[in-house]
Design a protein with these regions (language model features):
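Hydrophobic transmembrane alpha-helices and their immediate loop junctions
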Residues: 1-163
Length: 163
């Protein structure tokens, strides 16, 4: 029973953090005076489920503003999970909440790694002023390298499911 409760709690904790993450992107874009087009669901590389915010107007803002928008989801998550964890440590002392904090902390770090269309990837291509929508053959070497590494990660993940 406790294990089922832990999974249910982790699901709600994860759902809350996904919502807050995407809201961070939306609100930072709004602060700059731009709007998002939609919130959607997709399968990165046809395997990894992802919720995203379509932000076409991001191409109309400065490099620094783009970086802020791309990092805003991670920053709001970081602040949220640390606030919840401080409350937990001071008052609740809940082990499931401790585990959820650790799990999501790793997820935040993973999102900083510039692969699989992550926020870290978006920040990196912005720093290098790379237009990811350009013709694939004209893509910057860094984009091709990231795409190759991402593809290797996808292949390794799928293989690990069956081995």
């Amino acid at each position: 029973a406790n294990l089922h409760l832990a999974y249910i709690f982790l699901f709600f904790y994860l759902s809350l953090n996904i919502f807050i993450h995407e809201l961070g992107h939306i609100k930072s874009l709004n602060y700059i005076g731009k709007k998002h087009q939609k919130i959607g669901f997709k399968m990165n590389y046809y395997i990894f489920p992802a919720i995203y915010v379509e932000m076409n107007e991001i191409y109309l803002i400065s490099k620094n503003e783009k970086i802020i928008v791309h990092l805003a989801g991670l920053i709001t998550n970081y602040l949220t999970i640390n606030f919840i964890q401080v409350i937990n440590l001071l008052f609740l002392k809940n082990k499931i909440l401790d585990s959820s904090f650790i799990f999501f902390s790793y997820a935040l770090l993973w999102n900083l790694v510039p692969v699989l269309n992550s926020d870290g990837y978006k920040v990196l291509i912005t720093l290098f002023s790379v237009d990811e929508l350009e013709n694939k053959r004209k893509n910057h070497l860094i984009v091709k390298l990231i795409q190759a590494i991402s593809l290797l990660l996808v292949i390794e993940t799928v293989i690990s499911w069956f081995v």
